[in-house]
A protein has these predicted regions:
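ABC-family P-loop ATPase nucleotide-binding domain
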Residues: 1-14, 327-353
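ABC transporter nucleotide-binding domains
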Residues: 5-10, 15-212, 218
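Hydrophobic/anchoring residues in structured secondary elements
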Residues: 40, 268-271, 312
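ABC transporter nucleotide-binding domain
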Residues: 178-287
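Extended Gly/Ser/Thr-rich low-complexity repeat segments
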Residues: 295-306
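Conserved short beta-strand edge segments in small beta-sheet-based binding/regulatory domains
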Residues: 306-313
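Residue-level signature of catalytic and energy-coupling elements of molecular machines
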Residues: 321
């Protein structure tokens, strides 16, 4: 019979370091077989939440269950059902990929034969079978992260916590990890992901929770969150910056009815102009994207205004994040004072239960 209870349930979770509230009555539900992403600015409480769920920090106040088990009452049972991948690879550079996985297996009391068999399964699963005998020191960043991910799965966890899993990787390495995460979820694993890359949440997450001040301030699919900051927008780059205000008035009348837009609100400063150059890009909301480009081109042409580029786009998660939290997502750090996580796949140290 299918288990209908959530993979992770958090109600009223509170955690403080002295006078600093890292988590302040946080509520969250993670459904089984999904990727649930957590976004938040530096110090929002993301890593504190993950460490609490993974039994690395005690529950001060609130209800926390993982795979139906109370984290505060039965932390050892929780550890048997979870995997944790921290922000930094936890691998022995001098050992081979296979030796690393077998080591993690023995640390989890699998025994020699079971550890060797599981290592072989995971190397094959993550496309590392051909390089399993090579020292990890010769692995690329993406290969190391995939091996680290494999290590976190040594006990075949029901729930996997990924804390900034692709920090420091190049685009190719990130893509490799994304593909691995998708395959895990396809096989039934539940993934709770914290990330500083909004594209990562957009690519992977079934549901996204935006955390700020130790609370969930918004939650939904990527499309729903984008809808919170408005609908489609028309971006226009004019060839002559001296006609920017005129272009804004023309497009304002076309899409806004009166043209009574505040130019400062429409101007989007381009990242490409050199120092001292005037802005040439404007962005304004459009109620209906159908035919918007053609209408804009005709209106600008009628006034003799040349546009170098026009595009209709959806809001980005970056804009959602900035609107909701007032700060950009740029730092992988979290609330100060929380202890560092252990190596991937390694049981929590004594004293954390």
């Amino acid at each position: 019979m299918e288990n209908r209870e959530p993979a992770v349930l958090v109600e009223g979770l509170y955690k403080a370091y002295g006078d600093t509230r890292a988590l302040d009555g946080l509520d969250m539900t993670v459904e089984r077989g999904t990727v649930h992403a957590i976004l938040g600015p530096n110090g929002a409480g993301k890593t504190t939440l993950v460490r609490t769920l993974a039994t690395l920090l005690r529950v001060q106040r609130g209800r926390v269950e993982v795979d139906g088990i109370d984290v505060a009452a039965r932390p050892r049972d929780v550890r048997r059902r979870i995997g944790l991948l921290g922000q930094h690879a936890a691998l022995d550079e001098e050992l081979s990929g296979r030796q690393n996985l077998e080591l993690f297996g023995r640390l989890h009391h699998l025994g020699g034969r079971r550890a060797a068999a599981r290592a072989g399964e995971l190397l094959e699963r993550f496309g590392l079978a051909d390089t399993g005998k090579r020292p990890v020191s010769g692995y690329s960043g993406g290969m190391r992260r995939r091996l680290d991910l494999a290590a976190s799965l040594i006990v075949d966890p029901a729930v996997l916590f990924l804390d900034e899993p692709t920090t420091g990787l190049d685009p190719r390495g990130r893509t490799e990890v994304w593909e691995s995460v998708r395959s895990l979820v396809g096989a039934g694993t539940t993934v709770l992901l914290t990330t500083q890359y909004l594209e990562e949440a957009d690519q992977l997450a079934d549901l996204i929770s935006v955390v700020d001040g130790g609370r969930v301030i918004a939650e939904g699919t990527a499309d729903r969150l984008k809808g919170l900051v408005g609908g489609d927008r028309l971006d226009v780059v004019v060839a002559n910056p001296g006609r920017l205000a005129e272009a804004a008035a023309v497009l304002g009348r076309l899409f806004g009815g009166s043209g009574a837009f505040d130019l400062d609100q429409l101007v989007k400063f381009d990242q490409s102009p050199g120092e001292g150059e005037r802005p040439r890009r404007i962005s304004l909301p459009v109620a209906d994207r159908r035919g918007a480009l053609a209408r804009a081109v005709r209106a600008l042409d009628a006034e003799g205004i040349e546009a170098e580029d026009l595009a209709v786009r959806r809001p980005t998660l970056d804009e959602v994040f900035l609107r909701l939290t007032g700060s950009p997502a740029e730092s992988p750090a979290d609330a100060a004072g929380a202890p560092a996580p252990p190596a991937a796949g390694v049981p929590a140290a004594p004293g954390t239960t």
